[in-house]
A protein has these predicted regions:
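N-terminal secretory signal peptides that target proteins for export/translocation
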Residues: 1-5
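Bacterial N-terminal signal peptides
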Residues: 9-20
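Boundary at the C-terminal end of the N-terminal hydrophobic targeting segment
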Residues: 21-26
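A beta-strand edge to alpha-helix "cap/lid" segment located at domain peripheries
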Residues: 27-65, 72-186
Length: 186
């Protein structure tokens, strides 16, 4: 068979298979493997949960205690909030929780080559408490960089997140069911 014919056949023969693949139902992607963290990463996990609890408890002093003095929030924005005092001031209304509740939890914490720096990330749920709020719930995500101080305490150095989007009842339920109170150490 001439080379041109072999080339044409090699191109045309797979086409029916591609057509079948296009109409076949897509398989669900495999579930992501569960995160397994070191004991040091679990310290950061616990600290992230403690930070979230400070907002849930409307405790401004505990919130501020989780921040490095020179922390930067909205770190990827053109005008980050810089410094513990400014951040605590800007978050005061959110910490009060009178019109908006924010809750979050880590889904992953990671420590790399520097044992005093860690990254945490996970989902965040915003609940608008105003009567008739639409949407009532919005889901986003956060990512934080933690620094372990000379006193051994982990504090946030940088924080940012993903713009929240309206959330369905199923997404809200999945968020609430996804919180793990114990770090998945492995």
């Amino acid at each position: 068979m001439p080379v041109a014919s072999k080339l044409l056949l090699s191109i045309l023969l797979p086409l029916p298979l591609l057509s079948l693949a296009a109409v076949a139902p897509a398989a669900e992607p495999p579930a992501a493997p569960a995160a397994r963290m070191t004991s040091a990463e679990c310290e950061v996990w616990a600290r992230e949960l403690s930070f979230a609890q400070s907002v849930a408890d409307h405790d401004a002093a505990a919130f501020a205690a989780h921040l490095e003095p020179d922390a930067a929030f909205a770190a990827e924005s053109p005008q980050p909030q810089r410094g513990r005092d400014l951040i605590a001031s800007r978050w005061a209304g959110l910490i009060e929780g009178k019109t908006l509740l924010l809750s979050w939890y880590p889904s992953r914490t990671t420590i790399g080559g520097a044992d005093d720096v860690a990254v945490s990330s996970g989902p965040a749920l915003y609940e608008d408490l105003r009567p008739g709020a639409d949407p009532r719930y919005r889901i986003g995500a956060f990512h934080s960089v933690w620094h372990k101080g000379a006193d051994g305490a982990w504090r946030i150095l940088f924080d940012d997140g993903i713009e929240p989007q309206p959330a369905s009842d199923a997404q809200v339920a999945a968020f609430r069911q996804g919180r793990k109170p114990v770090c998945p150490q492995g």
